Regions:
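Membrane-interfacial helix-loop segments of redox and metal-homeostasis proteins
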Residues: 1-377
Length: 377
């Protein structure tokens, strides 16, 4: 349980919408430039399960950089209420195993999948939201985080014009940077040697992108596009992480306030975060699928055609929702929080997430081996 004083929640609709819109900008840019769907849990799961790709590290590094940059510009932050270390470890383990089983989280399914009207993503999101509400209510996550009973809606706050201006400028600068990366990737051959040199200095990480993967994840021919492919993911991580901070998603009390629907301090801000992201991603993804033949730096888009609603997907949604409701945090915000407000609880949560992903892989491998052995008898 948090040892801090009671936290009074405030309904922050514009913060949530603006932060969500910035999440949408990063998500669309990643798809247009690299052809990959943004999924934080996937970028954690691959290295956790022994698959190492440079863009995953770039993306996760961008999330960490967003947290560090916020501290550098805003100054030391007050300690953020978190559940106890043991509960955080359990919550992270459930989220890690659930996201691995369901192949996604609040970003991969909640934003990317729902923006494409994916039946799997809509089902998974519905399950983890419902279970999250139940877990937060039954196990009193609001109480564990010492959330005050005062109404959040009655304490609605609007950001200052200065804050809105900074966020708008950041979003515009991000769009400009993504456009610049796209232009760099497609402009002539003059910088080819520089790109090769950069690849050599990076220990072959950039060229590894091309040698390790097949389409749709293999970048297009040329060192420049291979380099931009990785740099783009780093910038996407930074922009996405900043959107998480602005929206309040890095604060477990905000998430728990939303999931605790029966609590007097119920805070609907989180719904507007997803709404802001989907308001951009839904038309953005439609435009990309209809009019963009290929990503800027890859051969094909990585859209999944799987629409099967199986037991593994549903079980993953249940586990993810349970962990989310118990701890009030999900993969993306947890990575940002490591650099922004590090604490034993957040390290335990992230460690639990990785553990859940590793255990899930080992159990799956054991089942597959057992099935093969049974089939050979």
């Amino acid at each position: 349980m948090s040892t801090l004083g009671a936290t009074a929640l405030q309904f922050t609709p514009l913060d949530a919408l603006c932060g969500g819109a910035i999440l949408g900008v990063a998500t669309i840019a990643k798809l247009m430039l690299t052809g990959r769907l943004l999924g934080v849990s996937a970028s954690v799961k691959r290295p956790a399960q022994g698959e190492f790709f440079s863009w995953d590290f770039a993306f996760l590094g961008g999330l960490l950089a967003a947290g560090a940059f916020h501290v550098a510009t805003a100054g030391p932050l007050p300690a953020e209420p978190m559940v106890g270390v043991g509960r955080a470890l359990l919550a992270g383990s459930l989220v890690g195993a659930g996201s691995a089983m369901g192949n996604g989280c609040t970003s991969g399914h909640g934003i990317c999948g729902n923006a494409r009207l994916s039946p799997r993503s809509m089902a998974y999101t519905g399950v983890f939201m419902l279970v999250g509400f139940i877990a937060a209510t039954v196990f009193d996550t609001a109480g564990a985080l010492n959330i005050a009973s005062a109404s959040a809606i009655n304490s609605t706050t609007i950001p200052s014009l200065a804050s809105l201006s900074v966020w708008a400028a950041f979003a515009a600068a991000s769009v400009g940077a993504f456009i610049g990366l796209g232009a760099l990737a497609t402009s002539g051959k003059a910088a080819g040697g520089a790109a090769y040199a950069t690849d050599e200095l990076s220990g072959g990480l950039v060229s590894g992108v091309q040698s390790e993967l097949k389409p749709p994840w293999q970048p297009s021919i040329g060192p420049r596009k291979r380099l931009v492919n990785v740099v783009a993911d780093g910038l996407v991580g930074f922009v996405f992480g900043t959107g998480l901070i602005i929206s309040g998603m890095t604060r477990p009390v905000k998430v728990a306030g939303f999931l605790s629907a029966l609590h007097p301090a119920w805070d609907p801000s989180l719904a507007l975060v997803m709404g802001g992201a989907l308001a951009l991603c839904a038309p953005g993804f439609y435009f990309i699928q209809k009019y963009q033949k290929a990503p800027v730096c890859s051969l094909e888009f990585g859209f999944s055609s799987n629409s099967k609603l199986d037991k593994r997907l549903m079980a993953g949604g249940v586990m993810f929702g349970a962990g989310w409701g118990l701890g009030g945090i999900c993969p993306g915000p947890s990575i940002v929080a490591l650099a922004m407000v590090p604490s034993p609880a957040i390290f335990a949560w992230v460690g639990g997430m990785v553990l859940g992903m590793v255990v899930n892989k080992n159990l799956l491998s054991t089942r597959q081996q057992s099935s093969l052995s049974a089939a050979s008898l």
